[in-house]
């Protein structure tokens, strides 16, 4: 998450509009007990929208997970979409490898753009970048023909 935060800041400083997608395999709830939107959902609304002059959010109950490509379609007005998770998507990826956390590269070679790591890795035909080299990672994203790819952490 820290890597994505830093990439957002760097890419924004370069003038890009950014969207992010975070996949949570455990489920999540962003609503707060006691708030009107929470009460609407508790009363049975399957979809709740909250809107103001500065923000818009929609909470929708699902019977099955929404297709990844359908989420992407909602964000096509942005220059760059950074994705955390969705390791099985067809997008090309920058995989984050952390010593003590990762034990192997899990992204197939044909889908990998680079590995961002906190240790020196010797990977055949795969670019390895220090995960703290935000400018270099942003340069790589900027250089890619397709601005929409995934960062798997």
Regions found by a protein language model. Give the residues of each.
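N-terminal phosphate/diphosphate-binding loop that engages ATP/GTP or pyrophosphate donors
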Residues: 6-62
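Charged helix-capping and loop-helix junction motifs
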Residues: 34, 64-67, 98-101
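Phosphate-binding/switch loop-helix module in NTP-utilizing enzymes
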Residues: 60-88
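C-terminal-of-GTPase-core extension/linker across diverse P-loop GTPases
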Residues: 149-153
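Phosphate/Mg2+-binding loops and adjacent switch elements
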Residues: 80-147
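Walker A/P-loop
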Residues: 1
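Solvent-exposed alpha-helices and their adjacent loops that cap or buttress functional pockets
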Residues: 41, 50, 74-75, 105-108
């Amino acid at each position: 998450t820290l890597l994505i935060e830093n990439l957002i800041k760097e890419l924004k400083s370069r003038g890009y509009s950014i969207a992010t997608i975070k996949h949570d395999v455990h489920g999540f709830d962003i609503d707060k007990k006691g708030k009107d939107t929470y009460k609407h959902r508790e009363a049975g609304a399957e979809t709740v929208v909250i809107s103001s002059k500065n923000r818009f959010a929609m909470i929708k109950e699902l019977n099955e997970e929404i297709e990844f490509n359908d989420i992407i379609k909602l964000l096509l007005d942005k220059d760059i979409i950074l994705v955390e998770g969705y390791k099985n998507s067809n997008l090309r990826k920058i995989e984050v490898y952390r010593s003590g956390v990762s034990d192997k590269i899990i992204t197939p070679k044909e889908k990998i753009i680079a590995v961002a790591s906190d240790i020196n890795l010797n990977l055949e035909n795969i670019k390895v970048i220090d995960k703290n080299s935000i400018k270099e990672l942003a340069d790589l994203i900027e250089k890619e023909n397709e601005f929409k790819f995934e960062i798997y952490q």
